């Protein structure tokens, strides 16, 4: 039977998003790039097979699930494994299958603690266990590449098209013009793809920032509600919350007001 883990609080043992993905990819030999890709449930099923061989029907797991109902089916397999091994944890399937960062990140943080409490270090071949299939669902990757779509890319190249159209009548050889245009399109497509990747990276970092900021804000509210109790522990927490780096200077609140008066 499994060792249950009930703590869900944020501690220094919690991994960051990047470290969590690195652990998952290394353990299961995957190439996940986003926490949201865990919404298919397939990775959790394989981790259960690693911890407790035979606890889940791995043949029923759809490692290349594309649709929400397929994700739900995978989580049903996981729930059956939890029940079989006595894992006292309710899986928020409805939230996880939506692919939201915060819900999936909270669950995988718990699962990592559960894994550490039950893993005995035995060898496991994840590729052979899933018969060589990858768990990155195509529809989870496709929106990332198609999100900007080609119309956005052609918008930046729009000013160049009239120039090409004006030069075409003057040049007797239209074929060379087409070749140059194709080469330019390829270069533009490459740059646009790089921009899109950077935008997605920023988006992920902002989600992670907001996630932890929300937790810090909740802690701050709890401390403020119990401010009059003179609890040394709460006072210490408040000191940590409001502590600043050495040399940090709080901006002068009067400066913005002076700028407003000038207008």
UniProtKB/Swiss-Prot annotation:
Disulfide bonds: none
Keyword list, A-Z: Cell cycle, Cell division, Cytoplasm, Cytoskeleton, Golgi apparatus, Microtubule, Mitosis
SUPFAM superfamilies per record: Calponin-homology domain, CH-domain, EB1 dimerisation domain-like
Function: Plus-end tracking protein (+TIP) that binds to the plus-end of microtubules and regulates the dynamics of the microtubule cytoskeleton. Promotes cytoplasmic microtubule nucleation and elongation. Involved in mitotic spindle positioning by stabilizing microtubules and promoting dynamic connection between astral microtubules and the cortex during mitotic chromosome segregation.
Residues of the EB1 C-terminal domain: 180-250
UniProt xrefs under InterPro entries: CH_dom, CH_dom_sf, EB1_C, EB1_C_sf, MAPRE
Protein name per Swiss-Prot or TrEMBL: Microtubule-associated protein RP/EB family member 1
